[in-house]
Amino acid sequence: MLAAVLGAVALYTFIGFIPGTDETSVLAPVTLALVLSGAPPQVVLSFFVSAVVTLNLMNGIPTALVGLPGGVMSAPLMEHSVLLRNRGLASDTIRKMAVGSAIGTLVSIPLSFALAGLIARFAEPIKAQAPLILAACAVLLALLGRNRILALVAIVPMALMFEALPALYHATHIIPADKKVSISFFLGITVGPMLVTLLELLNPRRREALPHGDRTRTALLRSGFRSQALMPGNLVTRSEGWWSTAMAALSTPLFMLSPVGLTFLLGEASVARMKDDPVRRSQRAVTVMSALTHSTYLAGVIIPLVALGFPVSGVSAGPAMPLFEAPPVYDLDHQDRKSTRLNSSHARLS
């Protein structure tokens, strides 16, 4: 188990530095390979949790330093990270992200296991109504945003597209009828803005409107690396710590909602009244959002896996899907108890 944890830290430390990565594309294949290798479910879960913590933490570095989203979960932090970078506070931003990540992890893991114990008794009704619950969560998340009507309307074409693409693949025999296809649209959250920016360079007017000047001078400072300065209590203010703790705890029971959406909504809610000082506002936002990136992701895999044994969240149906379905080791198609106990990581963990 320790080897799996250390391996995840080593691997995703390097992957996390690469901007624009998709969590599903970098977490799911390695997790699937580990499951198919015959590793015990406790080892696989430890690996996955370690990978999530490391990846989300390292994704904050390119976000803070160069203004590029390290991953899908870094997208909500972009605006505040760029503002702080322009003020010369990139190194402070990385430290605040690290403390926020630690807070989110420490709050979410025990709370997720506690909630899983409470929800386990309602597992069968939740499984039976999973499609309706997920649809209701999508509507709720749309209503919590600013452009409510547009968000509600957008659900329909997105749902049609996700149903139409597998049907098209089966109809054209690209994929056999008895096989499944998984669609991950999360990569578009990070790659989409980059592609739009590159396409804008083809427009002469847009190109001329871009800032032009000399080379940017960069200086690396050693300030803030004293042992006392690296204490968590000196890196974040008391309000930033309390807001991070509160929002991480609040997001954990909402594990069925989108982790990106929760990170943005709850993170912005924590700074809604801070309009006078943009720097302090952004510092609190990056701290709270870093806590939320960890709490939402960890709750999204721990609670469905431990309590339900069925993917009912975006995380469990995406990056963590090999923990639920990885034939022939884990198979959701087996409905009877004997088969379920033989083919379920949920049963082996319980």
Question: Model segments located where?
Answer:
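Membrane-interface alpha-helices at helix entry/exit sites of multi-pass transporters
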Residues: 41-46, 83-100, 276-288, 316-317
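Transmembrane alpha-helix interface/packing and boundary motifs in multi-pass membrane proteins
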Residues: 8-23, 55-67, 141-145, 248-257, ...
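Helix-loop-helix hairpins and the membrane-proximal interhelical loops
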Residues: 1-40, 117-125, 186-281
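Transmembrane helix boundary and interhelical junction motifs in multipass membrane proteins
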Residues: 17-29, 59-63, 71-74, 257-266, ...
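Transmembrane-helix bundle segments that line or gate the permeation/cavity pathway
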Residues: 106-117, 121, 128-215
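Single conserved hydrophobic/aromatic residue that forms the stacking wall/gate
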Residues: 342-349
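Helix-loop-helix module between adjacent transmembrane segments
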Residues: 15-16, 94-110, 255-256
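Central hydrophobic cores of alpha-helical transmembrane segments
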Residues: 26-30, 152-163, 316-321
